[in-house]
Amino acid sequence: MQEKEYKYVYKRSRSVAIVVRDGKILMERVVYFGREFYTVPGGGIEEGETPEQAALRELKEECGLEGKIIRPLAVQYKYDGSAEYSFEVEVSEDQEAITGYDPEETGENPPLKEVLWMSLDEISEKDRAFLWFYGLLTVDGYFEEIKSWGGEISYPGEGM
């Protein structure tokens, strides 16, 4: 029997910011390789940077917002040695979110298309899955909201 050779591929760790204001979640509309989806601000952790610093930097770059870490929400360790960190982040009410940029994505058609505040029922089930992965259920109010749905799961945007 021939032994299978595995090649290690380095993938840097990522960090994301979960920002909630007035019951809405700060989301980004992204079109990447022809696929449109909604996600939270975040990206790769740079050398010498902590996961917390990365989450705040990404929030500033992508949404134009200065934030403060409230607490860590989740850490997911990957098979390739990388990790995904998520943090609940507070942003002052006097700041307006703007569609920023991703310095790693240059060109005339960047993937980040729009920054917007969305309620949970406005987010499709497939995009919501990533919010659960990032620990949204531990943010005040969201566990109760999901429980209030009972056995029904909504599928906003179905048929779009």
Over which residues does each language-model region extend?
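Active-site segment of metal-dependent pyrophosphate-handling enzymes
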Residues: 64-104
